[in-house]
UniProtKB/Swiss-Prot annotation:
The keyword Transferase applies. InterPro entries: ExoRNase_PH_dom1, ExoRNase_PH_dom2, ExoRNase_PH_dom2_sf, KH_dom, KH_dom_type_1, KH_dom_type_1_sf, NA-bd_OB-fold, PNPase. It comes from Bradyrhizobium sp. (strain BTAi1 / ATCC BAA-1182). This is Polyribonucleotide nucleotidyltransferase. Its EC number is 2.7.7.8. Keywords: Cytoplasm, Magnesium, Metal-binding, Nucleotidyltransferase, RNA-binding, Transferase.
Length: 720
């Protein structure tokens, strides 16, 4: 019934198995990949005919994790998987980015790649396996895919690279780098690092590239057994259209792309396009070519002119040379009620970034396959349509926004203080208010400033820069701080973030079939120069975290109580802790080890809550003086609440230093008094005294009398 084919290799000390022919046989390509005991299924289906009216590759990639893969049942009312999680979205992008540039340019058929995690062994993250499985499924499917690709994760610890570190090993590594590419070149890099230098980062990329070659060979071996016949793709010759178009549009396009202001340049390019379309499609005449073909050629001509200008003259669209960074303006404290805020402007790219500090109640609970965990640092990136002068629909967070937000998160995360030193939940929101290239790196710079403005003690300020590439044969130019047009019309988007000490995040996407180690080395070196320059500009606004938290930020005090007192502080059904929160207005969080965190933006509220909790969790000391409130008056004395919820008796003989006939002659309910703890009787009842304390000053009269008596004795002895 089944015609199965499989290959198996040892990879990084664990078996990797690729199998096809048993599951999902109606898909164009289907591969079950197993690494350790982590299993994923990758499927590829492509439409039989091209999609009409599109000038792009209609590729969709969806990665999904099933709760059953980890032996769990989903939470929530419906008990089934819902919309994609952040992890699923990020892995979908991770698969998409290296495979997209490898499709034949003319391919316009709807193509869908779906990767499903079927089993997770809690050791091997499914993301790398998902990339490998998708590559194998595409290679078998018959779609015009110029792969296969391989992928690997690289860690770095004890001055050594680690291939595909396990989840446990990842907790101790200085690097989390994912690299993908072909047998010849690197196509994609995604990473987070603890301020590593350029040589270590480049070494990690090349280490990963070398070590996924056996995976590529295994996919080729499987394809030789089971691949379908390649589909035919109609390659259309547009050279005649391009020749005509050059004659009527080249000079106008060169002039348009010499205009430095984005909106003016776009208007000029649109005018040239209108002229070209009018030439090729005159009114009342039968056109020689399809409109879509002419529009495609115009787009290609735009790219060629920009690229020729840069390679021939070394000058870019806005007049800069290849290394110059646009003008930068940094401002902090721009929003009066925010805990921390910054406005970062670089040329025509601008980000308004806001930091908010919260407590343990604000931590995000993330339900992952490996288990539920809490996240205390959140970074959200928003890209509204007005940032590029367009209208658009506002709705749910888009994949791009999630991806850019995570990139900035990775850049900032390594320089945050440990949670035990700074016990806040921190949320950073970046509102991209203008965009002309590199808005994610503007988010990194703005986030660093906003965090320092809020008083978050970062290890060092962090900045980011986006690099581009123009590659024609053996000629190339690496561009610092790319514009949006240079991103769209160039061959590479290479983003580097870090501090003066090293790189914290590196992301690379290649639109051609890979770049060489030499080009990456040049790009990393040039990026460091740009990053140091940007950090210098940022230092004009703020050089380090403010000494104090923002005026409206909550303050958090942390202390410990005995674990056997936790129940008393919480109370039956949470009654006591609710009362503390309601009456003081402070937030209280108690952990299982007795750690108590009290948070409030009101200092008095915090003091009151701390005092209340400590009074419950500790015992009063004999001989100490306490403030108290008379809660009940009896014939034999008064009961006084003096230590949290603890009451004690002031016997009638201890009310005053004279004979008292009636308790009410001295006190009544509600009176504020000062009492001294005398001790406890045989039944454990608390004995208090008012007469031992000066009710005005709170001075201990018994101690005063003893001191005076002790001071007189030597004088008497001397007199004798």
């Amino acid at each position: 019934m089944f015609t199965k084919h499989s290959v198996e290799i040892d990879w990084g000390g664990r078996p990797l198995k690729l199998e096809t022919g048993k599951i999902a046989r109606q898909a164009d390509g289907a591969v079950v990949a197993t690494y350790g005991e982590t299993v994923v299924l990758a499927t590829v289906v492509a439409a039989k005919s091209p999609r009409e009216g599109v000038d792009f590759l209609p590729l969709t990639v969806d990665y999904q994790e099933k709760a059953y893969a980890a032996g769990r049942i989903p939470g929530g009312y419906f008990k089934r998987e819902g919309r994609p999680t952040e992890k699923e979205t990020l892995v979908s992008r991770l698969i998409d980015r290296p495979i997209r540039p490898l499709f034949v340019d003319a391919w316009r058929n709807e193509t869908q790649v779906i990767v499903t995690t079927l089993s997770h062994d809690m050791e091997n993250d499914p993301d790398i396996l998902a990339m490998v499985a998708a590559s194998a499924a595409l290679t078998l499917s018959g779609v015009p895919f110029k792969g296969p690709i391989g992928a690997a994760r690289v860690g770095f610890a004890n001055d050594e690279y680690i291939l595909n570190p396990t989840l446990d090993e990842m907790t101790d590594t200085q690097l989390d780098l994912v690299v993908a590419g072909t047998s010849d070149a690197v196509l994609m890099v995604e990473s987070e690092a603890k301020e590593l230098n350029e040589d270590i980062m480049l070494g990690a990329v090349m280490f990963g590239h070398r070590h996924f070659q056996p995976v590529i060979n295994a996919i080729i071996e499987l394809a030789e057994k089971a691949a379908k016949e390649p589909r035919d793709v109609a390659i259309i010759d547009n050279s005649a259209i391009e020749k005509e178009m050059l004659g009527i549009a080249e000079q106008d396009l060169r002039k348009a792309y010499a205009i430095p202001v984005k909106q003016e340049r776009y208007a000029a390019v649109a005018a040239v396009k209108e002229k070209v379309m009018a030439y090729f499609f005159p009114e009342g005449q039968e056109p020689k070519y399809e409109k879509l073909r002419v529009a495609d050629v115009f787009k290609e001509l735009e790219a060629k002119i920009v690229r020729w200008n840069i390679l021939d003259t070394g000058r870019r669209i806005d007049g800069r040379d290849v290394k110059t960074v646009r003008n930068i303006v940094c401002e902090v404290g721009v929003l009066p009620r925010a805990h921390g805020s910054a406005l970062f402007t670089r040329g025509e790219t601008q980000a308004l970034v806001v930091t908010t500090l919260g407590t343990g109640e604000d931590e995000q609970y993330i339900d992952a396959l490996s288990g539920t965990y809490k996240e205390t640092f959140l970074l959200h990136y928003n890209f509204p349509p007005y940032s590029v002068g367009e209208t658009g629909r506002l709705g749910g967070t888009k994949r791009r926004e999630i991806g850019h937000g995570k990139l900035a998160w990775r850049a900032i995360h390594p320089v945050l203080p440990p949670h035990h030193e700074f016990p806040y939940t921190t949320r950073v929101v970046s509102e991209v208010t203008e965009s002309n290239g590199s808005s994610s790196m503007a988010t990194v710079c703005g986030s660093s400033l906003a965090l320092m403005d809020a008083g978050v003690p970062l290890k060092r300020p962090t900045a980011g820069i986006a690099m581009g590439l123009i590659l024609e044969g053996s000629r190339y130019a690496v561009l610092s701080d790319i514009l949006g047009d240079e991103d769209h019309l160039g061959d590479m988007d290479f983003k580097v973030a870090g501090t003066e000490s090293g790189i914290t995040s590196l992301q690379m996407d290649i639109k051609i079939e890979g770049i060489t180690e030499e080009i990456m080395r040049v790009a990393l070196g040039q990026a460091r120069e740009g990053r140091i320059h940007i950090l210098g500009e940022m230092s004009k606004a703020l050089t380090a975290a403010r000494a104090e938290l923002g005026e409206y930020a909550p303050r958090i005090e942390t202390f410990k109580i005995p674990t056997d007192k936790i129940r008393e502080v919480i109370g039956t059904g949470g009654k006591v802790i609710r009362e503390i929160v309601e009456k003081t207005g402070a937030k209280v969080n108690i952990e299982d080890d007795g750690t108590v965190k009290v948070a409030s933006s009101d200092g008095e509220a915090m003091k009151a809550a701390i005092k209340w909790i400590k009074s419950i969790a500790s015992d009063p000391e004999i001989g100490q003086i306490y403030d108290g409130t008379v809660v009940k008056v009896m014939e034999f004395g008064a009961f006084v609440n003096f230590f949290g919820t603890r009451d004690g008796l002031v016997h009638i003989s201890q009310l005053a230093d004279k004979r008292v006939q009636k308790t009410t002659d001295v006190v009544k309910e509600g009176d504020k008094v000062k009492v001294k703890l005398l001790g406890f009787d045989d039944r454990g009842k608390t004995r208090l005294s008012m007469k031992a304390v000066d009710q005005t000053t709170g001075e201990d009269l018994e101690a005063k009398q003893k001191a005076e008596g002790g001071a007189e004795a030597p004088r008497e002895a001397a007199g004798e």
